[in-house]
Amino acid sequence: MNPKLQLSADNAYYHIRNAITTGKILPGERVITQQIATELSLSRTPIKEALARAEADGMVVRAGNWGYTVREITLRDAENIFEARMVVELACAQIAADNSNASDHEEMTRLWSKAHAAFDKGRLSDFLLASRQLHGFIAKCTGNNILLNLFNQVNNLVLLFALSLLRANPKRAAEIDAENKALIEAIKQKDKDLAGRLIRSQVVRAYEMYHQTLTNNQSNRIIKLKELVS
């Protein structure tokens, strides 16, 4: 792929990813290639490349011969995602506590401040994305590209339903904000055991919130996240 086409495909991918993670395109809904091409003033070719990448990331699925839809998360999917998140993010936090430096800590604090500002303004979507960006940077601080790639793979799936769950449980944002601040402090102090405990607690709390949301919506088979957005 030539550099210009690659750049267009990259831009299209992040546009699609943002539309999915912010709830502009909901689980089960069709991703319309021509609409995205028009929005970005691009041909259909880079859009198709972007959708193939999103499919590889698990964010969209093929829908017969007429394109792609946003992936719907089953109960089994969600259980697997939480399990993978526990393993990957716990490892990232503990290794980052050993490997990160003062410059890294400054960047973590900057990202936390970005998320905190969004939280203060009630912008849940921006808060969530900044929070996940912080965790992505922590993964980067491990210095382990394989672990970083695993984080990104799991994170793409987390983002498929995290915003809908947060909107259904908005008080959880304050808890996440405080948890992230405590996590940064543990990493600064190179306390890998505390960092691990904080991640474990955060993921367990998210898992409990997920099941509470299922209970509240009287579903135990498939989580129809489009029903939770309103």
Q: PLM features: residue spans?
A:
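Mobile beta-alpha loop/short-helix "lid" or hinge segments that flank ligand
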Residues: 56-61, 152-157, 171-174
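Conserved amphipathic alpha-helical segments that form helical-bundle/coiled-coil interaction surfaces
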Residues: 81, 102-163, 177-186, 194-206
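C-terminal regulatory/effector modules of DNA-binding transcriptional regulators
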Residues: 172-230
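Short helix-capping/hinge motifs at transmembrane helix termini and TM-loop junctions
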Residues: 97-98, 143, 167
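Short helix-capping and inter-helix turn/linker motifs at the boundaries of alpha-helical repeat units
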Residues: 7, 106, 171-175
